Amino acid sequence: MAEGETESPGPKKCGPYISSVTSQSVNLMIRGVVLFFIGVFLALVLNLLQIQRNVTLFPPDVIASIFSSAWWVPPCCGTASAVIGLLYPCIDRHLGEPHKFKREWSSVMRCVAVFVGINHASAKVDFDNNIQLSLTLAALSIGLWWTFDRSRSGFGLGVGIAFLATLVTQLLVYNGVYQYTSPDFLYVRSWLPCIFFAGGITMGNIGRQLAMYECKVIAEKSHQE
């Protein structure tokens, strides 16, 4: 037989590097989609909590006009959640400081519960003034970071997210893109940065946990190959 016939024309297998890159791209898309829907869900849940205070971001006549309604707020929150959740583990890898504090799903679920509780407190508890509300929510938000994160990168990103998100929100309100239903605008501004900070920490923890699961899957596949 000829030498060319000794080689079986079986299916070619991709090398471990190509397989790893493909897996990372697919897992990145999956993580982004999961984070997006989590952000949309939390936006709707937190909006229902704020309705109790009549401070919802959604005007009551949603179907009246596309421009006067805030139907796009949940998708925007979902997109921001996806970006934040993907950014946290990326920053950890870039800084060479992998986040190893309380890396289990039970801790992540408790973090989400505390975040929802902080929002519920801002909507349910009556404070004497806006300064007291701001200080209380700031303490709760920092406590959330200390309990479930404790990383310098997480704190820095949380502060940056709170600043940028609050700035964008106020610009949209001042330009009339949407409006708060509460007449007390100072009340809204007193809790908004703290909620954004806590939300950034929460989505960062979810993103880190999803990224850790991805690393386990890729490690198992490379070990099998």
UniProtKB/Swiss-Prot annotation:
Function, as annotated: Oxysterol-binding protein that mediates feedback control of cholesterol synthesis by controlling both endoplasmic reticulum to Golgi transport of SCAP and degradation of HMGCR. Acts as a negative regulator of cholesterol biosynthesis by mediating the retention of the SCAP-SREBP complex in the endoplasmic reticulum, thereby blocking the processing of sterol regulatory element-binding proteins (SREBPs) SREBF1/SREBP1 and SREBF2/SREBP2.
Phosphoserine: residues carrying this PTM: S151
Record's comment on post-translational modification: Phosphorylation at Ser-151 by PCK1 reduces binding to oxysterol, disrupting the interaction between INSIG2 and SCAP, thereby promoting nuclear translocation of SREBP proteins (SREBF1/SREBP1 or SREBF2/SREBP2) and subsequent transcription of downstream lipogenesis-related genes. Polyubiquitinated by AMFR/gp78 at Cys-215 in some tissues such as adipose tissues, undifferentiated myoblasts and liver, leading to its degradation. In differentiated myotubes, Cys-215 oxidation prevents ubiquitination at the same site, resulting in protein stabilization.
InterPro entries noted in UniProt: INSIG_fam
Organism of this sequence: Papio anubis (Olive baboon)
Cross-linked sites for Glycyl cysteine thioester (Cys-Gly) (interchain with G-Cter in ubiquitin): C215
GO biological process, alphabetically ordered: cellular response to insulin stimulus; cholesterol biosynthetic process; SREBP signaling pathway; SREBP-SCAP complex retention in endoplasmic reticulum
Pfam families listed in its UniProt record: INSIG
Membrane topology: Multi-pass membrane protein
PANTHER family linked to this entry: INSULIN-INDUCED GENE 1, INSULIN-INDUCED GENE 2 PROTEIN
Site entry (Required for the recognition of 25-hydroxycholesterol), positions: F115
Principal place of residence: endoplasmic reticulum
UniProt GO molecular function: oxysterol binding
Annotated keywords: Cholesterol metabolism, Endoplasmic reticulum, Lipid metabolism, Lipid-binding, Membrane, Oxidation, Phosphoprotein, Steroid metabolism, Sterol metabolism, Thioester bond, Transmembrane, Transmembrane helix, Ubl conjugation
Gene (name only): INSIG2
Residue numbers bearing the Cysteine sulfenic acid (-SOH) modification: C215
Family: Belongs to the INSIG family.
Name listed for the protein in its UniProt record: Insulin-induced gene 2 protein
TM regions (residue ranges): 29-51, 71-88, 104-126, 130-148, 154-175, 190-207
Cytoplasmic side: 1-28, 89-103, 149-153, 208-225
